[in-house]
Amino acid sequence: MKKDTMLAGRVTIPTDVDVVPETMELLNRWGADAIRDCDGTDYPEELKAVQAKVYSTYYTTRKDNAWAKAHPEEVQQCYIMTSFYTATETTLRIPLLKGIAKELMMVNNYDDKVRWWEVIDRSTAMVVSTDTWSYDKETGEVIITNCEPFHNYTVSFLAYLIWDPVHMYNAVVNGWQGVEHQITFDVRQPKTREYSMVRLRKFIEEHPYVDVIRYTTFFHQFTLVFDEMMREKYVDWYGYSASVSPYILEQFEKEVGYRFRPEFIIDQGYYNNQYRIPSKEFKDFQAFQRREVAKLAKEMVDITHEYGKEAMMFLGDHWIGTEPFMEEFKTIGLDAVVGSVGNGSTLRLISDIPGVKYTEGRFLPYFFPDTFHEGGDPVKEAKVNWVTARRAILRKPIDRIGYGGYLKLACQFPEFIDYVESVCNEFRELYENIKGTTPFCIKRVAVLNSWGKMRAWGAHMVHHALYQKQNYSYAGVIESLSGTPFEVSFISFDDIKKDKNILKNIDVIINVGDGDTAHTGGLVWEDADISSAIHQFVYEGGGLIGIGEPTGHQYQGRYIQLANVFGIEKETGFTLNYDKYNWDAVESHFITEDCTKEVDFGEGKKNMYALEGTTILVQMEKEVQMAVNEFGKGRSVYLSGLPYSFENSRVLYRSILWSAHEEENLHKWYSSNFNVEVHAYVKNNKYCVVNNTYEPQNTTIYRGDSSSFDLELEANEIIWYEI
């Protein structure tokens, strides 16, 4: 197994009892140095002595139904809100589990409902007195008396997760029949906590051949709800609503000194998703969860190290409260983090995590029947996944790559096996070339929103790397940034409020999203400390880029709160009485010089108009889509949307350079063809040119001193040079 490091290593493959010869073959062909099991597979006896690291997935919260059934009061719980129901008379009956899979949840009839449930008159936002409602266990309904006719009502209640949502998802997707539904137990609860430490020790002792415990995960499932037809009903990869129990909430109350309300989690039915501006109470709850999750996870990691094993965390599933970009995470003491790679943004979600010895990306496709079936094209999916993620790897590499699922399925596609072999070799080469150095960054860019670093690289991501029509025009900005030569940070309005001097270490700020959301700020713009800090930043020479409805919030005669900086305002109807005369777009501009066609703004924005003195780059039917403006010594750029594409990445790149007054540095580690990118590693005396497309490309390459040469590249090709 031992090979030259350029020829082997840094790759993890899955296995199962019926693919031992195939596993051994791929250890050599792919140069793998680690083997893992997966949900629904078993580790073969024959491979326990293999000369490779062995990962074993360890489920901290499931795969022990005997314990869960013996302690039903310590099964993990979730806050759920019913649909809105309109009272047509003074009595109203609201069914709690209507629209939810009965296999997934069971109403918590154990704890004090008066204390932990909440009925709200949504027409008045008033909490309904507990004296006027009751729960009918037989029908599963809450009965409200003394209703106000034609008011809307909801019930917020606790339910037990009687089928682990991830296990349910895997069972539905793979068509598993007759499998026992795994119940999610709550490791935070006292009996289960004590038992879990004994259970972990027993597992490690019974698996002496295992080198790495791959924790899945610590300890609360992201919000994932299915309807009666087993379809996804609600999903939030960052959702906290399944991290609750009366036991946890009583601890929270003691720490913060005020009474908990279900509405802190329910949030009118929006569940504090990342588009909602977080309340003080929810931020307090997140901080509490981070501390408690880290404290308990550290106990497990310490046990792992006591046995001489490595502790790896899977980034996903039951990971709520770990928050890898926050300070508490590094106190856990993990050796590694592994996560699924769906694109460049999700690659950076993993590779940028501080405080671990190494990171690993699990690449797509997962070896499941939804891709590996007759007529399926796993090679195409693998190519798209690798080439998309490679941009981000070249900026901040993960340390390892891997695959998961049923190896038997993958082996039925020889072309796929061949392609992944080439990916493994290419990854090892680029890792050797760039390890230990920071690539050349032309400017420092900060994405500004309400979440800051807590949602670094996950901004505008509802479900892991999945497309949403309403936000792809914004998520594309984050994806573009994941592979561009900038030092990227994520800052919050709270960060600026705490110390506006942080802006002195930033060249360009990006504010991207719809108005009155957490991404653009909403109510925060009524705080003069925030608005004046950004005004001053730009006035003194900083760059500001706004996409969508940046700083959008109706207040004091403005919707776009930095309208005088952007030179752009939105017509909401309030300014129809004012005539607008600035509609002429310039024929050319530095930002659009590389565009080969009309700029793709995605969904764009309606009713945006330019103020006097603003330079319009693109307007369509008297609606501004792109414009630039000068404010003091600084510059701003406005775009109505910017979905991810190579051409749009170039538009963003030029926008950043222009707003930072860096036009003269365009031809520095630069490709004239936007389908091709250049990454320089000055410390390692290397640079590479990479073709991001699936066809050959011609380009002119500019080195760091602006000298140039012409180049032809094959499809997907990457070429390395000495500086």
Curated annotation (Swiss-Prot):
One of its GO terms (biological process) is carbohydrate metabolic process. It catalyses: beta-D-galactosyl-(1->3)-N-acetyl-D-glucosamine + phosphate = alpha-D-galactose 1-phosphate + N-acetyl-D-glucosamine. One of its GO terms (molecular function) is 1,3-beta-galactosyl-N-acetylhexosamine phosphorylase activity. The active site is at residue 317. Keywords: Carbohydrate metabolism, Glycosyltransferase, Transferase. It comes from the Bacteria. The keyword Glycosyltransferase applies. Its EC number is 2.4.1.211. Gene3D superfamilies: 3.40.50.880, Glycosidases, Golgi alpha-mannosidase II, Immunoglobulins. Belongs to the glycoside hydrolase 112 family. Reversibly phosphorolyzes beta-D-galactopyranosyl-(1->3)-N-acetyl-D-glucosamine to form alpha-D-galactopyranose 1-phosphate and acetyl-D-glucosamine. Active towards galacto-N-biose and lacto-N-biose. Does not phosphorolyze galacto-N-tetraose or lacto-N-tetraose. In the reverse reaction has activity toward N-acetyl-D-glucosamine and N-acetyl-D-galactosamine, but not L-rhamnose, D-glucose or D-galactose. This is 1,3-beta-galactosyl-N-acetylhexosamine phosphorylase Cphy0577. It comes from Lachnoclostridium phytofermentans (strain ATCC 700394 / DSM 18823 / ISDg).
